[in-house]
Amino acid sequence: MVFTVSCSKMSSIVDRDDSSIFDGLVEEDDKDKAKRVSRNKSEKKRRDQFNVLIKELGSMLPGNARKMDKSTVLQKSIDFLRKHKEITAQSDASEIRQDWKPTFLSNEEFTQLMLEALDGFFLAIMTDGSIIYVSESVTSLLEHLPSDLVDQSVFNFIPEGEHSEVYKILSTHLLESDSLTPEYLKSKNQLEFCCHMLRGTIDPKEPSTYEYVRFIGNFKSLNSVPTSAHNGFEGTIQRTHRPSYEDRVCFVATVRLATPQFIKEMCTVEEPNEEFTSRHSLEWKFLFLDHRAPPIIGYLPFEVLGTSGYDYYHVDDLENLAKCHEHLMQYGKGKSCYYRFLTKGQQWIWLQTHYYITYHQWNSRPEFIVCTHTVVSYAEVRAERRRELGIEESLPDAAADKSQDSGSDNRINTVSLKEALERFDHSPTPSASSRSSRKSSHTAVSDPSSTPTKIPTDTSTPPRQHLPAHEKMAQRRSSFSSQSMNSQSVGPSLTQPVISQAANLPVPQGMSQFQFSAQLGAMQHLKDQLEQRTRMIEANIHRQQEELRKIQEQLQMVHGQGLQMFLQQSNPGLNFGSVQLSSGNSSNIQQLTPINMQGQVVPTNQIQSGMNAGHIGTSQHLIQQQSLQSTSTQQSQQSVMSGHSQQTSLASQTQSTLTAPLYNTMVISQPAPGSMVQIPSSMPQNSTQSATVTTFTQDRQIRFSQGQQLVTKLVTAPVACGAVMVPSTMLMGQVVTAYPTFATQQQQAQTLSVTQQQPQQQQPQQQQPQQQQPQQQQQSSQEQQLPSVPQPSQAQLTQSPQQFLQTSRLLHGNPSTQLILSAAFPLQQSTFPPSHHQQHQSQQQQQLSRHRTDSLTDPSKVQPQ
């Protein structure tokens, strides 16, 4: 019993121990599991952080185009850190001592400030005098661009009297190879001398001016200088110079002005096209200045408000600025010239301003002027000034070596035809980029990225000749006009050379397919331009040929035409106008004998004999007789009837009196542009009445007896009364008309008809007094039917004998005038036989004494219009 109890106790104890052990094991497993979970979490977090750091480190390494594993990233990081440690050690050796350089300034800024404070610039010269480097600060001191000095000899800028001394200094102070030590910055090899240097000018024709300067420097060997201390200096040396010297020794000096400049031009432009805005009053006082101005000019807005802009301008630019401002006041907007503005740091910066005037919105009065100022470099200013002076300045060959490697200089602007033509003209010689960077290059000794951007090429390469734009256009037009005479072949002749050159143009080494396709596109554009110009030239040629054909037709029409000379006396002076006859039968023209003007009968033979023989006395008597007879006959109106009639539509003007022709000119007092003069060319042989001129009002018409005739219609154009025109036999197509004397007659039409007939049978002089009485009665009856006409004064109708005397002397005394008259008139002297001529000469006095009413007919036969 007891054993049984004990056994049960023991079994219960064992069961309890097993359960406790199991529970303990379960607890331990739970603890281990929790530890593992926490450990895994921490490990995952650590791995994630490590991967993030590796990824970030890989992104900072160069050449991370492809995905790198962790070991590669770590290896490159180690290499970079090792190289950085070496560079840092070398930089510490060349670092400017901190005891005299402010900590907030970099080496680059400190060097620039030191050069400005010393009024100096850096210059690197080879032992033979070739300049291989010059700093930008030379512009503010000597007004030279760095590109003007680089690759030039220093002796070109030194007076001839100092050449020998400077050459001796450069050639005798050479460093030996054993003396080159790492302590090259020390002054044991320092060289110092003084000389004169040439100042730069905008106009090369100005007289030379030299500045006294001091050279302080050392001879340095580039082989002993650490690469990090080159500062990009090696990259600035021309490639043509690099193999030219074996020892790589040059003289690096600081050039200082002996006389310091207190105000200098700012030689560098940190950012291209920097600009700021300001507002000015009409008196040019500052009213507003934006936030971009202080970093450029140094002034805060409150420092300049209320001050005049002219206080900050250079004295040499005031005159040009005043002209620009006057232009602004006249036109309301404009652009100024380049001018210098004084900054707060006492430096001159070059600006160009675009301005316009704003007006008040209510009263439209000028309110203020808005200006936008742009900072420009001295290189742009000098180039613009030289273009104004007519000096062609070639573009600086900036970065020529780099452009040769990259092939970027072979690109053709597909928009500009001019540049494409220049490319084809100068295809063997590569050119530099047309636009160089305006970013300032600094002169520091530790920044390898600060290198100049304007380095010219070797001087052995001949520069491209630049012609003015108008000369290029003239040459191009002349070449086009010479080739366009053959319109059938001008197109192929212009385009085939371009196409063949495009086909044979090799692809330069290093040029991409895109660049070559750009060239082909430019050539195609050039071809289209040439074809379009060819079509325009062909159209111009066709138009000119058509005009030439019309001119030839007009010349044929006027060729061989005869001329008639008429003289009108409307004032005491003589006025002449041109009269032209159309081509017709010359025999009919030569048969015209008498001329009836204002009732006067003057035979043509008398005029011809008076012109050829020079009977001055007879001519004077003839003019006096004609004037007296004209005065007596102006009191009546007359009409003429014959077998055939001719009508002309010109309104009358009674002050006009035609006398015998002396010149081949005629003046018709008529302001109306639609007036016409009709002159018959032939007359019947057997006519019993002589035609006269009858003057009516504008609602009447005149009828004349005519035979077969040839009429020329001449459209007249008004000119001044004093104009005299003597047309030639080839180019005659107008009649010059003079304005009438009185304004009341300017709106009236005028009718004038001149007929020529064969001479009638002359009547004895004794019968004329007997016929005067019936003729006067007939005239009085005719005046009752016709309207009254105002009578001219005796002074207007009388021709001065002295004028006729001078005219006769002019005709008979000048052989060239007789030659011109003989060439202008197709009438031949053989037409009038000598006997017939003498017969008319003997009857001259009888014809002068006749009254103009001998040929009057019955007034009832006149048919009014």
Swiss-Prot record:
Record-marked site positions (Interaction with E-box DNA): 39, 43, 47
Substrates-to-products reaction catalysed: L-lysyl-[protein] + acetyl-CoA = N(6)-acetyl-L-lysyl-[protein] + CoA + H(+)
UniProt key word Transcription: yes
Keywords noted in UniProt: Activator, Biological rhythms, Cytoplasm, DNA damage, DNA-binding, Isopeptide bond, Nucleus, Phosphoprotein, Repeat, Transcription, Transcription regulation, Transferase, Ubl conjugation
Xref: CDD domains: bHLH-PAS_CLOCK (cd19734), PAS (cd00130)
Top enzyme category: transferase
Protein name (record): Circadian locomoter output cycles protein kaput
Species assigned in the record: Spalax carmeli
Classification of source organism: Eukaryota, Metazoa, Chordata, Craniata, Vertebrata
